């Protein structure tokens, strides 16, 4: 075994293996990850119990329905303008029964993340998930992490708080790496191979991407996800974030993390070992498996995801990444190597540019052009060793403002 400190995500270390049912707090309960996690819990009531829910407030009726069905103790909602609507919806469902505790405001999910439970599933989208991630770690909860942005923007902060084995990755690629890494030690690992579907625009040149529309970008060939993540998959920013995440989670240098395009999305990632063997984790595209690993590890949840029908012929293809058409992975490696506030700037600028693209204010190629310009202007980041939460927030605020300025300028020039 290596004498290096254990990585953030280590399949060899069981952080908290409790007997009986596990109490779960679900953050982002009305989103894609949250709804699928709740479905898994409802199918396995002997294994899991959801004790609290948090959501932004965009789907009030669903949040109230989830709370009632799961009989949770507390509900958190970020938007204060929907509190009365939520309270009314809860009263209609609960009748004369006592309502769950209601937490309101931007920090409501963070407060909930520190509440008593076994596991916090952070399914929030975006860097707003950082504070809940830190709160869950500080409170000693097992963290099933689907919110990759919190690790990206606050890597050194997360590493300072997390205990060995405390983080279990939920996204499909890192759940795959996590399982494959269980077959050996870090000293046995030659490289990590992260697979990418290639998105809806695989095979197109940069010039052919110039006229991509919102509808085109949201038509992902293999995964059903929210709009921001779907656009990130189309630009391959999502894959760039996953490269940074793999480095942080598994303590593997960037030059030993490779991205390959696998259109079928059957193989979710691979680990190549020093003896020349490669271990791949494969299932049909479905988030049930990664979610089950996140909240159930080291146990496996039966029938969490569909299995392959090996009696049917299938084709599995692998292609090199087109770095000219999709420069996002290379830029992500660059900011990951810079460290400090650079990943936060990259992520925040991208979030603003994706929002502008979805609103029709920025062309598809303009997303990465603008993000690249913002990263270049940021210059030397605050060092990772001295990084603080205010540093991250300040860098994000600057990056968002600068991205909006550059996006508006690019749009004005295009219309002139």
What positions do the PLM features span?
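Catalytic, metal-anchored helix/loop core of enzyme active sites in primary metabolism
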Residues: 1-416
């Amino acid at each position: 075994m290596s004498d290096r400190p254990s990585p953030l995500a280590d399949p060899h270390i069981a952080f908290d293996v409790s007997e009986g049912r596990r109490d779960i707090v679900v953050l982002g309960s009305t989103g894609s990850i949250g709804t699928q996690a709740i479905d898994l819990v409802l199918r396995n009531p002997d294994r899991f119990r959801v004790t609290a829910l948090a959501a932004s407030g965009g789907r009030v009726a669903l949040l109230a329905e989830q709370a009632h069905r799961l009989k949770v103790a507390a509900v958190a909602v970020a938007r204060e303008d929907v509190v009365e609507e939520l309270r009314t919806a809860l009263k209609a469902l609960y009748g004369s029964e006592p309502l769950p505790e209601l937490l309101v405001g931007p920090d409501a999910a963070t407060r909930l993340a520190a509440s008593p439970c076994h596991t916090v599933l952070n399914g929030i989208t975006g860097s707003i998930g950082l504070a809940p991630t830190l709160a869950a770690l500080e409170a000693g909860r097992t963290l099933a992490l689907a919110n990759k942005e919190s690790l990206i923007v606050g890597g050194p902060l997360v590493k300072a708080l997390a205990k060995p084995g405390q983080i279990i990755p939920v996204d499909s690629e890192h759940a795959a790496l996590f399982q494959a890494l269980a077959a050996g030690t870090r000293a046995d690992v030659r490289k990590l191979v992260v697979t990418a579907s290639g998105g809806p625009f695989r095979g197109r040149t940069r010039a052919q991407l110039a006229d991509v529309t919102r509808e085109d970008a949201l038509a992902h060939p293999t995964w059903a996800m929210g709009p921001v993540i779907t656009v990130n998959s189309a630009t391959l920013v999502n894959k760039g974030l996953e490269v940074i995440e793999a480095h942080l989670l598994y303590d593997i240098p960037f030059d030993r993390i490779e991205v390959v395009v696998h259109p079928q999305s059957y193989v979710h990632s691979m680990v190549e070992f020093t003896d020349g063997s490669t271990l791949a984790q494969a299932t049909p595209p479905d988030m049930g498996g990664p979610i089950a690993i996140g909240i159930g590890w080291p146990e496996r949840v039966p029938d969490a995801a569909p299995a392959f029908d090996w009696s049917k012929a299938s084709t599995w293809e692998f292609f090199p990444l087109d770095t000219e058409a999709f420069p996002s992975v290379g830029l992500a490696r660059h900011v990951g190597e810079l460290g400090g506030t650079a990943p936060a700037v990259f992520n925040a600028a991208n979030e603003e540019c994706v929002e502008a693209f979805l609103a029709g204010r920025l062309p598809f190629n303009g997303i990465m052009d603008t993000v690249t310009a913002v990263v270049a202007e940021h210059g030397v980041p605050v060092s990772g060793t001295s990084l603080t939460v205010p540093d991250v927030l300040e860098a994000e605020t600057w990056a968002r403002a600068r991205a909006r300025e550059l996006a508006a300028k690019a749009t004005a020039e295009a219309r002139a």
